[in-house]
Amino acid sequence: MSGHSKWNNIQHRKGAQDKKRAKLFTKFGRELTIAAKEGGGDPNFNPRLRLAIEKAKAGNMPKDILERAIKKGSGELEGVDFTEMRYEGYGPAGTAFIVEAVTDNKNRTASEMRMTFTRKDGNLGADGAVSWMFKKKGVITVKAEGIDADEFMMAALEAGAEDVTEDDGYFEVTTEYTEFQTVLENLKNAGYQYEEAEISMIPENTVEITDLETAKKVMALYDALEDLDDSQNVYSNFDIPDEILEQLD
């Protein structure tokens, strides 16, 4: 990933696959439940829940399913007791991986993570094994079409952004993770609509993958981790050039 934009391209590729296998609603539902459990069921007083609702609606999640997920988190309906977990490990060519998961059975999820890393030429590490290689940041992506670049960059910085870049038809706004919700709300109030908005783990340095076979192995691990039922987000520090990445589709 040269820069976060290429990482977004990989995530978009996975996003299309997620929709085909209908896993996206499960991810939305768990995030809604966790967000409601953490901060209550009223999105007016719970920024994380507000963002989760926006994403679920954008992904065409049925309203009744969305509302049930929130009520399970707020305690209005009986539901599974989910816990957020993080797993860290190494993949092929020394690549680092972080998996954020939501689980109702820590032992099951840990076993599945360990098995997946092992089967795909990787190793599951201890807590903190690779997280020091990443920084937790807010990332907001806005389509650049029809927007004056100078005006947007000024608006984003005034909104509290840490950095703004433009690449491949999109503006990418980076924030301190503690300022993410504030910057997002400020941009929306200024009239800008986001394409994606999330708290992400950004690698401080990347591992460049220059041959197709190694790229296949790295992406095989990435895909396998994404496919696990309890996985919510998968981050890594690999950098696969576009010309090689295109051969993997």
From Swiss-Prot:
It comes from the Bacteria. GO terms for cellular component: cytosol. This is Probable transcriptional regulatory protein FN1661. It comes from Fusobacterium nucleatum subsp. nucleatum (strain ATCC 25586 / DSM 15643 / BCRC 10681 / CIP 101130 / JCM 8532 / KCTC 2640 / LMG 13131 / VPI 4355). InterPro entries: Integrase-like_N, TACO1_YebC-like_2nd/3rd_dom, TACO1_YebC_N, Transcrip_reg_TACO1-like, Transcrip_reg_TACO1-like_dom3, YebC-like. Residues 1-10 have a biased composition (Polar residues). Coiled coil: none annotated. GO terms for molecular function: DNA binding.
